[in-house]
């Protein structure tokens, strides 16, 4: 069987990684799927971070 085109990726908050003084400890992570053929670069979306308590950029991690 052929490998599927869609893969599951994890998005991590960029501000939580670099900022230590925030509302609560931890790093916000989301999982989503992306099409490997259409989006070859790393995915970056604005999502709500519960630790920062605001909308921030979330980048794809390995």
Curated annotation (Swiss-Prot):
The keyword Zinc does not apply. PROSITE patterns: RIBOSOMAL_L33. GO terms for biological process: translation. One of its GO terms (cellular component) is ribosome. GO terms for molecular function: structural constituent of ribosome. It holds the Pfam family Ribosomal_L33. Keywords: Ribonucleoprotein, Ribosomal protein. Disulfide bonds: none annotated. HAMAP family: Ribosomal_bL33. Belongs to the bacterial ribosomal protein bL33 family. NCBIfam families: PRK00504.1 (NF001764), PRK00595.1 (NF001860), rpmG_bact (TIGR01023). This is Large ribosomal subunit protein bL33. It comes from Acaryochloris marina (strain MBIC 11017).
